[in-house]
Amino acid sequence: MDNVVDRHVFYISDGTAITAEVLGHAVMSQFPVTISSITLPFVENESRARAVKDQIDAIYQQTGVRPLVFYSIVLPEIRAIILQSEGFCQDIVQALVAPLQQEMKQDPTPIAHRTHGLNPGNLNKYDARIAAIDYTLAHDDGISLRNLDQAQVILLGVSRCGKTPTSLYLAMQFGIRAANYPFIADDMDNLTLPTSLKPLQHKLFGLTIDPERLAAIREERRENSRYASLRQCRMEVAEVEALYRKNQIPCLNSTNYSVEEIATKILDIMGLNRRMY
């Protein structure tokens, strides 16, 4: 493996820059380098584009290394200014559009903000996503057991195993109505599936975690407590995993997975439709 090299990476767009970030991060993850990321959204006029160019040039002058620039910009006059910079510039969308244009024998009609902006064609989808987020927040950590039948998935697990961030990611990224229910220390003496969840067993998904990792996470929250002790964590994890087995609840060990990976595995295992926004 080559030596690790620091590089400055720009993600530039005339919109939110989310597309530039996602594709740029995917590309950069293939290289063993430490990067310093700079995201610049809404570069929509020439004066802002020139300021961005100056920022790129300044880093080049300071480091002697060309910054990497991933951009997605519709207006050619704005693109031209960025291309005059000292950065190594890559039009991430055009790299995919050009071969598709040839294959489909059809010219694209690029419009700024089409991917993540609001327009009459996607308002219903946007409203559905906001409703999913509201639902998920209202049903976080067992706050409310009302309307659980409206959930598309109900995550179960001990405290600090990743239920809340995964639920929110499912709602925000995919518009999934995700509730979650915690099993706490007081439940462990006689752990059973709550009556309110039994009719919804087809929507239940369990999260578990290595006790050592759980103890480390809890220690940051409540140092030197029984709650964070390895013995307590081992007991809780063992009890919850036994409950999953007894009730045939699909489950996943979240220890070595990111929130994005956990959410994607849940969608796959539960057969939930992915909806991109």
From Swiss-Prot:
Q: Which GO terms describe its molecular function?
A: ADP binding; ATP binding; phosphotransferase activity, phosphate group as acceptor; protein serine/threonine kinase activity
A Pfam family annotated for this chain is: Kinase-PPPase
Q: Which UniProt keywords apply?
A: Kinase, Nucleotide-binding, Serine/threonine-protein kinase, Transferase
- Which enzyme class, named as a word? transferase
Entries under InterPro entries matching the protein: Kinase-pyrophosphorylase (IPR005177), PSRP (IPR026530)
Catalysis performed (reactions): [pyruvate, water dikinase] + ADP = [pyruvate, water dikinase]-phosphate + AMP + H(+); [pyruvate, water dikinase]-phosphate + phosphate + H(+) = [pyruvate, water dikinase] + diphosphate
Name the EC number(s).
Answer: 2.7.11.33, 2.7.4.28
* Protein purpose: Bifunctional serine/threonine kinase and phosphorylase involved in the regulation of the phosphoenolpyruvate synthase (PEPS) by catalyzing its phosphorylation/dephosphorylation.
Q: Which protein are we looking at?
A: Phosphoenolpyruvate synthase regulatory protein
Q: Which organism is it from?
A: Salmonella gallinarum (strain 287/91 / NCTC 13346)
What is this protein's gene name? ppsR
